[in-house]
Amino acid sequence: MEVKVFRVSGYFEKDGRKFKFTKEYRALKEEHVKELVYSDIGSRHKVKRRKIFIKEIREIKPEEAEDIVVRRLSLEL
């Protein structure tokens, strides 16, 4: 199994306001990425899963990653 790089974009609602986000993760499958997004955004911003809306999950090349940690981990191997 090969670890892939995914870019996730969407928004979450808190206190009647909408906040956009774009995140990059390394994972084996899209389902794993969804779980990471819900866990990460929920814990950082104290938002319930039903208030997190994922618009797009896209697989990208490791070279396209903007997050330095994700890029370095992906290109090391």
UniProtKB/Swiss-Prot annotation:
Keyword flag Transport: no
This protein's UniProt keywords: Ribonucleoprotein, Ribosomal protein, RNA-binding, rRNA-binding
Claim: Ligase is one of the keywords in the record: no
GO annotation (BP), single: translation
Entry's Gene Ontology cellular component terms: ribonucleoprotein complex; ribosome
A GO term, aspect molecular function: large ribosomal subunit rRNA binding
Domain of life: Archaea
InterPro entries according to UniProt: Ribosomal_eL20 (IPR028877), Ribosomal_eL20_dom (IPR023573)
Gene3D superfamilies xref list: 3.10.20.10
One Pfam family in the UniProt entry: Ribosomal_L18A
HAMAP family with a match to the protein in the record: Ribosomal_eL20
Subunit structure: Part of the 50S ribosomal subunit. Binds 23S rRNA.
Family note: Belongs to the eukaryotic ribosomal protein eL20 family.
Protein name: Large ribosomal subunit protein eL20
Organism: Pyrococcus horikoshii (strain ATCC 700860 / DSM 12428 / JCM 9974 / NBRC 100139 / OT-3)
